[in-house]
Every structure is written in C-alpha cells, then in structure tokens.
Amino acid sequence: MLKKTIDVSKKARYYMLGNPQSNISKVWFVLHGYAMLSEFFIQKFKNLDDGNTLIIAPEALNRFYINDYYSRVGASWMTKEERKTDIEENINYLNLLSKKIFEEIGHTNFKLNILGFSQGGATACRWIFASHMKIDSLVLWASDLPQDTLIEK
C-alpha cells in the first residue's frame, strides 16, 4: 500500500469581538482548547471588548462529534495522526489570518497578545516560535510549553 497526500483548499472560520480599525490599540488572539468551538470560546472575552481592543478566536481546522448522539461538535488543533502536518497547517492558517487582520487594522502600533487554552496553548506556542513574531504577552491557560518548542536550534 502506498500512502500519498494532496494539498486542498479549505475554509477556516474565526470569530471576532470588535472591529479591525485604526483606533485599535490591543489585539488578542484567543485559541480554544480540545473539543471546543471558537463561537463559544470567544464569549469568555466579552469584557475585553472596549472599542480599542480586537479579539480574534480562530477555530481549529478539524471538527468532530463529541458525543454518541451527534448533537455536539468540537474542534481539535491536532491529534497523533498526521500530527506534524496538522501543526504545519495550523501555523499556515494562523499566519494567513493574522496577516489579514493586521492589514485590516491598517497599522502596527498595537499590543499583540496571544492566549491559548489547553491544546490551544500548545498551538499558540508553536505558532509564535515558528513565525518568529514579536508579541507583547503570551498567556497559557491550563497548558504547558510543548517540548518541541524547547529544542535548541
């Protein structure tokens, strides 16, 4: 048996609180945990929406049913299957999304903050390390630094 892959285009969804406009002084990317959806996760950050803050909740690219009744759906940033590919696709997705958001804001004079919850924390770390982006703060909520980001290069 021969395993092969093909690149495909996929729509990725994300939710925002606030509008990407010139008065933005703070940007938060908030990455949800395993089996969560960004639509609900972003609700936890409503109090940050002060007119000068933009909150973006990207949703992991892999959705699945989380119960036996097919009534609840969650999303996962990665599993052990094709893990490296999932990580690369997450980084590409987050890079494209952040570039789009920054262009919409129209300036770079804002504080960039990233919060990752659980599995989203590992994804946030990998994104930051792979992208070499400058951030003002990283918040890991119920998460650790992934071992593969601690390897000296």
For each predicted feature, which ranges?
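Serine-hydrolase catalytic machinery in alpha/beta-hydrolase-like enzymes
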Residues: 8-107
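The feature captures the conserved acid-bearing segment of alpha/beta-hydrolase catalytic domains
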Residues: 15, 144-153
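Structural motif
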Residues: 26-27, 111-113, 137
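Active-site signature of alpha/beta-hydrolase-fold catalytic machinery across serine-
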Residues: 43, 126-130
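Alpha/beta-hydrolase-fold catalytic nucleophile elbow
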Residues: 59, 115, 139-142
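Gly/Ala-rich beta-loop-alpha elbow adjacent to hydrolase catalytic centers
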Residues: 115-120, 124
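Hydrolases whose catalytic domains are alpha/beta-hydrolase-1, hotdog thioesterase
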Residues: 123-127, 149
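A conserved short beta-strand
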Residues: 133-146
